[in-house]
């Protein structure tokens, strides 16, 4: 199993690293940190056709990853990888500019991805202003204290309900 930043995996394919040395026993390849270019994903899948490939998403502030997508089909160069679904201990949702929920029933509409759950950190060390801006009470919950992390990342749902990263 290998878990790597996307940039590290891309360096291997860009510099023809498979021609130099190729590990023979990789069965799971998971990547995170940025959007994986399909060209590089396809190169890795050629080298390891029997391996499980998993696209991970999540910022450091929620202990690294909050969604996963198991890649179970070929992707064309013009396609994007979905972000997948949340881990069991996380809730991932989108808010619009007015802090209203943007659900999957509104495909194509951008919203800021927010995360709640057991992996959300307590904030930024010695930076209360930044913490107060990003770690806030869930505006959808007025019944009890529920801190969420506002990632600042914009995402959208496709027509078939898949979640996609748009921009930071």
PLM region spans:
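Adenylate-forming
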Residues: 1-82, 87-102, 129
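AMP-dependent adenylate-forming
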Residues: 46, 52-55, 70-168
């Amino acid at each position: 199993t290998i878990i790597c930043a996307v940039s590290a995996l891309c360096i291997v394919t860009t510099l023809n690293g498979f021609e130099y040395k190729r590990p023979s026993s990789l069965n799971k390849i998971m990547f995170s940190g940025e959007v994986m270019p399909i060209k590089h994903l396809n190169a890795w899948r050629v080298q390891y056709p029997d391996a499980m490939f998993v696209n991970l998403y999540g910022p450091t502030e929620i202990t690294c990853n909050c969604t996963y997508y198991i890649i179970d089909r070929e992707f064309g160069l013009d396609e994007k990888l979905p972000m997948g679904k949340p881990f069991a201990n996380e809730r991932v949702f989108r808010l619009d500019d007015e802090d209203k929920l943007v659900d999957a029933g509104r495909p194509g509409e951008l919203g800021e991805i927010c995360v709640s759950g057991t992996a959300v950190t307590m904030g930024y060390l010695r930076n209360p202003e930044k913490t107060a801006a990003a770690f806030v009470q869930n505006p959808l919950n007025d019944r009890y204290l529920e801190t969420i992390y506002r990632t600042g990342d914009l995402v959208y749902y496709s027509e078939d309900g898949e979640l996609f990263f748009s921009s930071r």
